Amino acid sequence: MYRLHANDPLADDAMKLLEDSGIFEISKGHYDKDELKKNLGGIEFLVVRSATKVTADVLSAGKDLKVIGRAGVGLDNVDVDAAKKLGIQVYNTPGANAISVAELTMGLLISLVRHIPRGTSGLKDSLWEKKKLKGNEIFGKTLGLIGFGAIGKEVAKRALAFGMRVLAYDPYVKNTKMDVELYSDLESMLPEVDGVSLHVPLNNETKHIISKKEFDLVKDGALIINAARGGVLDEQALYDAIISEKVKAAALDVFEVEPPNDELRRKLLGLDNVIATPHIGASTVEGQVRVGIEMAKKLIEVGKKL
């Protein structure tokens, strides 16, 4: 049997799959970085979510580590290059939470154009701002997707159902059967769109993929939505673009600094035309079960082959 430690929680159904497989001796419970390094001895499979940072020194401490399972999409919390050098396999679940993130994206978009958060907070403060909260329809508008993987495709399905024109930039996608116009470069797509929605992982290629240069290219009054990773969007440039009214409004589920309590993020969140959620894109009951089960099945498959 292999020793498996779940440093972050998985859905009960996923844990049962791992237990019933008969190939793992399982422990669970969150260790911080220093505790994790001390307790990795003998652990061959390590399961994490976004709360655990698997850095090079953590990996080096895991002398028996064979497999890292990242239950979720992003691998920015795992030093994949260091793992590769040490011969440690790394797996994630890229499509499992796509529906959850796509639904939140559409919710953020509609909340933004119809002023739902402001309407709610106003009513709670006994304000009746009916005349002030004139919004816009998304029907007939053009949405530009940066990233057209599993999540981007799910967003496209929903945007098309709302009657939007959908454009997408993804250098790794050359064709699609969907009614989506693919672009080979951002510079050509951005001037065409009324709103931009980011759906890319955070890596060296995508760090600040939207910054001042890109904001200069979008239509005046464009909308920005980020439910991907905070680092893919230059938040200082976003703040400046909103202040200059180049960007009309933004909806953010993720931040380069989380929790977003530093000066820049507080200024950004203090703007009336910025709405935000605390990185809850994948936080649905169904999404968590799907992520956990997919991760469990993958680890069982790998364990049987080792």
Locate predicted features:
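Structural/interface elements that position substrates and couple domains in central-metabolism enzymes
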Residues: Y2-H5, D13, G22-S27, G95-S100, ...
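Short, Asp-centered acidic motifs that coordinate Mg2+ and/or phosphate
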Residues: E44-F45, V67, G195, L223, ...
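Phosphate-binding beta-alpha-beta segment of Rossmann-like dinucleotide-binding domains, i.e.
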Residues: L86-I88, P94-T142, A150, E154-K157, ...
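An N-terminal-biased, well-structured beta-alpha scaffold segment characteristic
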Residues: M1-Y91, S188-P191, S211-K213, L217
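Residue-level detector of alpha-helix initiation sites
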Residues: K53, G74-N77, A96-N97, T142, ...
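Short glycine-/small-residue-rich Rossmann-like dinucleotide-binding loops
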Residues: H30, A51, V73, D194, ...
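Rossmann-like dinucleotide/phosphate-binding beta-alpha-beta segment
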Residues: K131-D220
